[in-house]
């Protein structure tokens, strides 16, 4: 009620947000509660529900007061139904490193490739309202060369880390970075970075590719 700016549009059982980067979500009203089925489902207590107004308690325990718009032009904000997906890596990033092990020179390559795989991350406004933003994940190609001979090459996706991260963390993370760390008696060492988009939260993963091309993966301490 404090602004005339359109915030959301209700159509059927779906909420469409004015922010093009926020994904639409389904909802259901049961008695005095509205359930929002976003990436992280939430429930809000309804304080008032009439034909022209809707008040509810946010997760921050604030009363959010919404009113039905009487301005037909407000619907123009919702003309596009395409969610604006946020690209975390606009273009391919190439990195290479050279290491010497037992008088042999190795070159490790990393190619961070933007993909069309979508990651849904739930964020919360200062008022305690949740919205889902959508990001593109990356596929990272790694390879190791001795001179012109390729010793190892593989595409890495975050799905490969499903055994060491809970699904609720992995689902909201992107494969953000990768570094070639070196070569030793165990094999070729890489370190991957899994991060939550637009936050400082990240985890490191150590990857060792043995000389027989088998891979071991573990969380970095």
Tell where the protein language model's regions lie, with residue ranges:
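Tryptophan-anchored aromatic micro-motifs
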Residues: 1-6, 80-94
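N-terminal glycine/threonine-rich, aromatic-flanked beta-hairpin/loop signature
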Residues: 2-41, 132-148
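Short, exposed beta-strand/loop patches in secreted or surface proteins that constitute
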Residues: 6-10, 25-29, 44-48, 98, ...
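Mid-chain, structured segments of secreted extracytoplasmic proteins
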Residues: 30-61
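Short beta-strand elements that form the blades of beta-propeller/WD-repeat-like
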Residues: 54-56, 101-115, 125-131, 186-196
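Short, exposed beta-strand-loop hairpins at the edges of beta-sheets
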Residues: 54-58, 194-212
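Surface-exposed loop/turn elements that mediate protein-protein interactions on large endomembrane-trafficking
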Residues: 143-165, 206-215
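Acidic, glycine-rich flexible loop segments
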Residues: 160-200
């Amino acid at each position: 009620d404090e602004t005339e700016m359109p915030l959301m549009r209700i159509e059927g059982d779906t909420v469409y947000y004015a922010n093009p980067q926020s994904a639409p979500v389904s909802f259901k009203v049961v008695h005095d509660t509205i359930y929002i089925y976003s990436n992280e489902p939430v429930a809000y207590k309804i304080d008032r529900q009439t034909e022209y107004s809707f008040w509810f308690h946010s997760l921050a325990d604030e009363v959010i007061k919404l009113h039905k718009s009487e301005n037909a032009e407000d619907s123009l904000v919702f003309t596009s139904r395409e969610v604006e997906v946020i690209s975390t890596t606009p273009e391919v990033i190439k990195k290479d490193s050279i290491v010497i092990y037992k008088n042999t020179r190795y070159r490790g390559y990393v190619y961070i490739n933007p993909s069309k795989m979508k990651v849904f991350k739930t964020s919360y406004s200062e008022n305690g309202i949740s919205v889902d933003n959508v990001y593109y994940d990356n596929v990272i190609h790694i390879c190791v060369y001795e001179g012109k001979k390729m010793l190892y090459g593989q595409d890495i996706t975050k799905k490969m880390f499903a055994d060491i991260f809970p699904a609720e963390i992995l689902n909201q993370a992107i494969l953000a970075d990768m570094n070639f760390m070196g070569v030793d008696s165990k094999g070729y060492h890489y370190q991957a970075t899994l991060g939550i988009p637009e936050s400082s939260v990240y985890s490191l993963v150590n990857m060792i590719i043995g000389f027989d091309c088998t891979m071991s993966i573990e969380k970095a301490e």
